[in-house]
């Protein structure tokens, strides 16, 4: 079985911790079994492995999130990067092409699609195993997971099973199919509250965005748009796929569709209010909480302390991107305000580690300076590169590494300073965990001002 995890999102609903470069699934805010903290994406992959579902995990993502996935999960997962952000159908089509043409998977192999940021329990993954079994037994071409609703939500699409109007008939209809599978009658997009109540009376399920099918089934659909011999060709012609969701392009057009019900813990931690319910503590980071706070949470990623006192139903979040103080009931509005911000992300994860912007200044003559603290994980390196519009000064503050400037190597340690003129090739590799301060001077100071010559050395 092959598992494709979808990783996307713009990262605005949990601002200031999330941003365009760090979506919610990468925030290490959940309690880990080892006593530390883990992100949503780390939690889901851990649960998949604990359930022994499969070792064959492929991420379908965009270029911005690729490095974060590798940084948090290592090299044990495959990552398929779409050339541009489109929608779930082209992303799934590209990942399926990767399995078929790059990994040489058989057409009969079962593929499961699921989101990477779901907050759920072990029964969820047992339900996925039932979906796989249903596909293997040819119950339907496409099998979905149906989440048993807990209230008439307007936030989710619904899956309506065929000829089911009571709990008894659900049980009766189940016996027709393998492992609690029900035939799907129709799909309904996000309804208003009254329509949602009617759907619940029809025993409809929330569409949880989990699909199972044979690889050959999906490749037949892919070939309707792009027929190539190699994955690289498909990747180059990616824009020929329609910009449309998998639900619209595949699920709603499928002639043979079944749904496997799931009843259990299932949450979208995409709002501050929902996330606070699962935080392991009322405060994370350098936070001091007074004695008279009520239902208040604080998360601080800055080095300076945050003190909370006399607050009720409030969320306080501080990061290099900004500071938010918000009533919990109004926390869903934060995305509207975050969308108005035009500043660059101040914190990013890369395949080699992380960086944080400390200062960004423009001087009277138009020259700019940008100061970062950069952390390289032991054994990792940044690419051999040059810049056309800026010089850089690096100051090593922790650890040891190997610095290269125009082909000349030298060992560096805490206290060493490295000057990099405009247009000169340079790189650094961490012998141990390595932290250095980078000061860029020039104009413009943008991430795109980089010409890479070698990624690994």
What function would you assign to each model-found segment?
Residues 41, 95, 117, 159, ...:
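Residue-level signal for inorganic ion chemistry
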Residues 121-238, 258:
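Conserved core of the sugar-phosphate nucleotidyltransferase
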Residues 437-445:
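C-terminal structural segments of small proteins and small subunits
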Residues 6, 114, 396, 439:
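Catalytic metal- and UDP-sugar-binding loop of GT-A-like glycosyltransferases, i.e.
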Residues 213-418, 424-430, 445, 451-456:
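Left-handed beta-helix
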Residues 2-5, 15-20, 28-115, 119-126, ...:
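Conserved N-terminal catalytic core of the sugar/cofactor nucleotidyltransferase
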Residues 11-16, 23, 447:
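Short N-terminal binding/cap micro-motifs at the start of the first secondary-structure element
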């Amino acid at each position: 079985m092959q598992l494709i995890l979808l990783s996307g999102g713009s990262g605005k609903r949990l601002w200031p911790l999330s941003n365009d470069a760090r979506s919610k699934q990468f925030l290490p805010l959940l309690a880990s079994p080892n006593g530390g903290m883990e992100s949503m994406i780390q939690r889901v992959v851990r649960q998949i492995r604990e359930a022994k579902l499969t070792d064959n995990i492929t991420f379908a993502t965009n270029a911005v999130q690729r490095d974060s996935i590798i940084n948090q999960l290592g090299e044990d997962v495959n990552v398929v990067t779409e050339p541009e952000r489109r929608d779930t159908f082209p992303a799934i089509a590209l990942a399926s092409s990767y399995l078929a043409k790059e990994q040489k998977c058989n057409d009969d192999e079962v593929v499961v699609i699921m989101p990477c940021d779901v907050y759920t329990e072990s029964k969820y993954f047992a339900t996925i195993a039932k979906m796989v079994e249903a596909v293997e037994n040819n119950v339907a071409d496409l099998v979905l997971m149906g989440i048993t609703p807990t209230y008439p939500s307007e936030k989710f699409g619904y899956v309506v099973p065929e000829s089911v109007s009571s709990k008894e008939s659900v049980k009766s209809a189940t016996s027709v199919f393998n492992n609690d599978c029900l035939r799907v009658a129709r799909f309904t997009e996000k309804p208003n509250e009254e329509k949602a109540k009617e759907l619940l009376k029809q025993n409809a399920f929330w569409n949880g965005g989990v699909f199972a099918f044979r690889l050959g089934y999906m490749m037949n659909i892919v070939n309707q748009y792009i027929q190539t011999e190699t994955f690289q060709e498909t990747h180059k012609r990616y824009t020929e796929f329609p910009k449309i969701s998998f639900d619209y392009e595949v699920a709603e057009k499928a002639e043979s569709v079944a749904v496997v019900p799931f009843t259990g813990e299932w949450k979208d931690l995409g709002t501050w209010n929902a996330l606070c319910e699962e935080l392991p503590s009322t405060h994370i980071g350098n936070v001091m909480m007074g004695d008279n706070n009520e239902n208040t949470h604080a998360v601080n990623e800055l080095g300076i302390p945050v003190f909370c006192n006399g607050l009720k139903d409030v969320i306080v979040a501080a990061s290099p991107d900004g500071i938010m103080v918000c009533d919990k009931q109004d926390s869903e509005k934060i995305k509207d305000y975050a969308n108005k911000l035009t500043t660059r992300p101040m914190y990013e994860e890369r395949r080699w580690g992380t960086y944080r912007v400390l200062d960004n200044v423009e001087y009277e003559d138009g020259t700019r300076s940008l100061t970062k603290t950069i952390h390289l994980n032991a054994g990792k390196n940044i690419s051999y590169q040059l810049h056309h519009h800026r010089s850089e000064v690096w100051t090593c503050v922790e650890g040891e590494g190997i610095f290269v400037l125009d082909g000349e190597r030298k060992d560096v340690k805490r206290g060493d300073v490295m000057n990099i003129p405009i247009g000169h090739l340079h790189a650094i590799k961490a012998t141990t965990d390595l932290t250095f301060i980078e000061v860029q001077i020039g104009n413009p100071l943008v991430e795109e001002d980089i010409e890479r010559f070698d990624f690994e050395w």
